[in-house]
Amino acid sequence: MLHAVSNVTRAVLLSGAAIAGLVPPSSAADGKAETYLAVWASDKETDDHHLDPDFLAIIDADPRSPTYGKVVNTAALESVPNANLLDELGLASGVASDVLNEAHHMNHDPITVYGRQYLFPAGLMSANIFRCDVTDPLHIPTCPLVTTSTQVKKFAGIDDIVQLPNNHLLVTYLGAKDLTTPGGLVEIDVEGNVVHEYDAAQAGGPTRYMPSVRGVTDTGLLAHPHGMDFRPDLGVVVTSDYADPSSIATNTAPWNPDQDLGTTVRVWDVSHLDAGPQKIVQVPAGASIEPNRVQNAPEGLMEVGLTHLHRHKGAFTASMQGGTLFYSPDITAPSPVFREVYDVGPGAGASLFIVTADDWYLILPVAGILSPGDPNYDRDYQGEHSRRLVALDIQRLLAAGPRIECDAPRVVMGPDGFTKKILGHNNGAPDCPVEAGSLNLDSEGNFASHGGPHFIAVDHESRRIAAANYFVQLTPFGLPGTMSGGDDRVCMAWLTPAGELIRDERFKDELTGQPCVALDRPTSYLWPNRGRTGAAKPHMLAFINLPDETGSEERGDDQ
């Protein structure tokens, strides 16, 4: 969770003209970087046809450092035989814990426990959770395996992780033990012990806007928790339902109509998680009816995000396949209502966004997914499926309170009853989000793999955005996966007070000299503390800021 910044701090933060002046060319006084970027990555066995362990990469992320952008360390995972969901399900035998995890989520910021900083990387396919001591990013001990698939009795498919007030971690599990439906939440302590498993499925939910792929109409049963956010002051945990894991693991095309996707948001009382979700909300379908049902606006709610300031109680959610951003002004209301406020486009891959700490901007990664020649590619406007980051100014939307005018855009329907064209991002009301800036991340690798920027991390001390161009690819498992990978680059941008997103050209690959750091390393490359293991797939990122020795850190009034 990001912390609020004061108006004074915001006033001196980066502008496009001042970036060079605000980043001194010299390194820190002691020659050591003060900011690092942790990258949770899996081995990309397709380059050398050899499966190497998954790992945590550490990139120098201090703009003042002479090694800025260089991979300066890696951390290994504990290798425990037969510690993988594949073993538990009888799909494989002897799989060690440090391979075939499919590196996915970890906590968004390091957690401090007894003076040490920890990240908890988790495997989407292995259902393993590791704990990495990143207190000294240049000297990270082997990350122990703290939670295995066998410790969790009901669920599998690990996704998001947040910290609770009691310092426990709450984890979303996308599916059931056999990677079908339903999923749930699991609470663990910092030692990895399972405290409780919470069912997300609850019969009697709202009727799905149309029956699911398998004909289910009760959304209460279609629990696929993926995105998650938490507001301690409101006492709520909010989760979004993405997809039945088995239906996306066997995908044969990015636009496969057989994907069984989620269309609901679940609201939980943090003090009574064992009671299950208190509210289940079906997001609206809008006026568009796509010929491919999985590209309708609500399909595949990948992420959910809450506003931060006390005066705001809003929630956003975004659909990966539907390509749409939704907003509800008060998630604590008895029956929250979401509205479609920004339509990127069908199949555009609206991914894991963040709301800035001051509630000023929403930064949305657009993975694009569709590529030239695919059905619906750039159907509605030029650049619809460009891979990019978008900064949306949400001030007027939040200021409108419950009296929101912004809504879904108009559409042109064809004689077959399906949408021919979507006219704009929304209805153009005065309170609609306004695009303040964007950063194009198109590349041959992104188009060829039907991927793009999926996850972003924010350094709230410098207002920098790091983006990973990778989603999920399951070729090491003998599965087609999501058919949406990425070019495996990690890119850096500055967010200015005006909402501009400016690529940091100094954050460049140490081998090629090109902007962005490529994890597709040649087999000749010697990874620090790892060896010559070739290319890797970066999914999640987290900034690590070394403690300020003065002990001072300015925070705002969170009013």
What are these model-predicted stretches?
Residues I456, S462-Q559:
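Blade-level signature of beta-propeller repeat domains, shared across WD40, Kelch, NHL, RCC1
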Residues Y36-L51, T172-G183, T239-G262, L364-H385, ...:
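Short, conserved, GDST-rich strand-edge loop motifs in beta-rich repeat architectures
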Residues V134-P232, D241-T252, T263, P291:
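Asp-box/WD-like beta-propeller blade repeats and closely related beta-sheet repeat scaffolds
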